[in-house]
């Protein structure tokens, strides 16, 4: 009888300890980069960027981002439009030590990115170093198709769990252009996914703000 009581007591104790063990959730997360929608309020721009990741180890995530950008540019030298799609893939590594039951992240990561796009020039000025008076702008619709670019991104960011499986995040990105196809006699002033391109400078920066939802698959 005493052995039975001791066994039952140990069983209850083990059950209580097991109930206190918090299991980590593994699943697919999908999200929206809302910085695109914010830009649409202040610029001649529209775009959409979707985010997806999956945890493959305790701190390691495989990440894919796909999107589309349409950007109008108008300055003293040129009036043009750039539009196209892009895809980015890479890894995030979580540096943050969570308390049991929490799923917050402070991470570093990288992306390898590619974009396919086209540009349309509506007006432009011809530069002449010997000209003293301002040049009238030439009006001529010129469409450049089949443009492309490749670059890499280094990233620092965070994701915080607002509610069960719902996250908000932000990231700062340093971009390095690797290769781009440019139209004859013109430059790519904007590359979808990379953002602004400046002459003789292959670097760029970007900030993202994201809302992310996790579809839990397993806990372990």
Regions found by a protein language model. Give the residues of each.
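Glycine- and aromatic-enriched membrane insertion/assembly motifs of diderm outer-membrane
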Residues: 43-100, 113-114
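Transmembrane beta-strands of outer-membrane beta-barrel pores
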Residues: 34-38, 66-72, 93-95, 112-118, ...
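Extracellular/periplasm-exposed beta-strand and loop segments of Gram-negative cell-envelope proteins
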Residues: 39, 67, 71-84, 117-128, ...
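Membrane-embedded beta-strand positions of outer-membrane beta-barrel proteins
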Residues: 30-32, 52, 64, 89-91, ...
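Residues that define the transmembrane beta-barrel architecture of outer-membrane proteins
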Residues: 26, 44-48, 83-87, 104, ...
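Short glycine/proline- and aromatic-enriched beta-strand/turn motifs that initiate or cap beta-hairpins
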Residues: 12-55, 65, 210-220
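Short loop/turn motifs that connect adjacent beta-strands in outer-membrane beta-barrel proteins
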Residues: 15-26, 59, 97-105, 162-168, ...
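Outer-membrane beta-barrel "beta-signal"
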Residues: 88, 92, 201-220
């Amino acid at each position: 009888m005493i052995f039975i009581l001791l066994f039952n007591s140990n069983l209850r104790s083990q059950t209580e300890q097991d109930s206190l063990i918090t299991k980590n959730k593994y699943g697919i997360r999908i999200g929206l980069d809302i910085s695109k929608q914010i830009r649409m309020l202040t610029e001649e721009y529209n775009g959409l960027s979707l985010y997806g990741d999956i945890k493959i180890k305790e701190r390691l995530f495989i990440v894919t981002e796909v999107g589309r950008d349409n950007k109008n540019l108008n300055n003293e030298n040129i009036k043009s439009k750039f539009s196209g799609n892009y895809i980015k893939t890479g890894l995030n590594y979580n540096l943050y030590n969570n308390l049991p039951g929490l799923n917050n992240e402070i991470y570093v990561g990288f992306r390898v990115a590619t974009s396919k796009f086209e540009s349309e020039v509506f007006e432009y000025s011809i530069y002449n170093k010997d000209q003293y008076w301002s040049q009238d702008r030439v009006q001529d619709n010129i469409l450049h198709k089949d443009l492309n670019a490749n670059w890499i991104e280094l990233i620092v960011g965070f994701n915080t769990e607002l509610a069960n499986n719902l996250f908000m995040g932000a990231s700062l990105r340093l971009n390095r252009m690797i290769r781009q196809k440019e139209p004859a006699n013109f430059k790519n002033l904007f590359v979808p996914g990379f953002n602004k391109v400046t002459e003789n400078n292959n670097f760029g920066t970007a900030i993202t703000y994201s809302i992310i939802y996790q579809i839990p698959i397993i806990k372990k």
